[in-house]
Amino acid sequence: MHPPGFKNFLLLVSSLFFIGLSAAPQSFSPSLRSLSGAPCRLSRAESERRCRAPGQPPGSALCHDRGRCECGVCICHVTEPGTYFGPLCECHDWVCETYDGKTCAGHGTCDCGKCKCDVGWSGEACQYPTKCDLTKKISNQMCKNSQDVICSNAGTCHCGRCKCDNSDGHGLIYGKFCECDDRECIDDETEEICGGHGKCYCGNCYCEAGWHGDKCEFQCDITPWESKRRCTSPDGKVCSNRGTCVCGECSCHDVDPTGDWGDIHGDTCECDERDCRAVYDRYSDDFCSGHGQCNCGRCDCRAGWYGKKCEHPKNCPLSAEESTRKCQGSSDLPCSGRGRCECGRCTCYPPGDSRVYGKTCECDDRRCEDLDGVVCGGRGTCSCGRCVCEKGWFGKLCQHPRKCNMTEEQSRSLCESADGTLCSGKGSCHCGKCICSGEEWYISGEFCDCDDRDCDKHDGLICTGNGICSCGNCECWDGWNGNACEIWLGTEYP
């Protein structure tokens, strides 16, 4: 039993509801909702119009395809790193230009995809100072890349900064020195960057999973997991950390274009022929002493020979250790690093060179010569690699006179290095020439400014004992070559 007037109240509510429906737009959809969750009072067409950029026709992207439209309002979302914002999701905090790795070159702020430059700066990335106090010469010098080419021949120099040539409007040339050209990534057939299957960075394509090729033009018919499995070496590393896995096959790095020491090969790049350098025998000018073959960096010795370098004959009554010990003498190296040890006896090298001699090749009279071949500066004699100077002279090569006709002031002025320091603080001055400290054997050079430890070594010897270290570089004696003078180019060894 309803109270009196309840029936009249229901009639009033019903009539108001139907009046509201008749006043609503004909295309009103109860499924549209406002941000508050209440039904949207806009038609679908009007809601979408408000979510489109001005001037865009019906059916075009809503919210720049970066969000969803709710009752005429864009709710932006993220589909890649960064944040979308703006009334129509038209702004992105990563789209501003960068220069030298900095957004707006660090001289402005990013405002909806465009740099707002600080006072005194201009350019799309705020990279150009409005006033330039550099000379053209200095400006051009600052614009040179590592090959000394101004703006990589792909732009012009403005006050020490490169402006890349992007007259086509695509902006594919960029970088501090315009060194990056993403046109290299465009597929000739599809005219798409990386064939539409990868990202381009500085002219190189980085392909999506399942695609490979210089421009991601080839599709792989195996799963990424299977591809990785096929490329994994026995030690569990993909391509032994020496190559790139492409669709289940390893492309090994080209580590030695000269071919001097071999390359990397094998199904999983497990074989590094550079390791053969450790078994190269400079006295036989061959790997494995000429008595074996280097395979994957190790010697496979022929019958009758054994050892790391196949250097020990099996018919020798001495063990390898005994043989090496007899050849060492007082040196840490067999035959003082200047000869071949076989069955406890040293054969000094180079062959036929009487300047290297001794039971363990301990004497090397080449050390008494300068680069012109003059022994002890013409002022002494050589005895087992050391100069015995004539009266009135001293020094490693008898290069210093004991009497000096200079004043101390004149002498010191000739011993000062470029920074004004006397003999670089590592030696003493005598008659206008620096005598480097004997306590630090590795200090050398006209002003004691060189460190002989910077020279290459082989078999534990600087310049392999076959040359002179000259300020970090090996100057090899006749018949020897290589960064460490380790390669014999003279007559064939017997």
From Swiss-Prot:
Alphabetical keyword list: Disulfide bond, EGF-like domain, Glycoprotein, Repeat, Secreted, Signal
GO-annotated biological processes: cell adhesion mediated by integrin; cell migration; cell-cell adhesion; cell-matrix adhesion; integrin-mediated signaling pathway
InterPro entries recorded: EGF-like_dom, EGF_extracell, Integrin_bsu
Residue span(s) of domain I-EGF: 40-90, 91-127, 132-179, 180-217, 220-270, 271-311, 316-362, 363-399, 404-449, 450-486
Region (Cysteine-rich tandem repeats) location: 51-494
Source organism, top-level taxon: Eukaryota
Signal peptide: 1-23
Residue positions the entry lists as glycosylated: 405
Name used for this protein in its record: Integrin beta-like protein 1
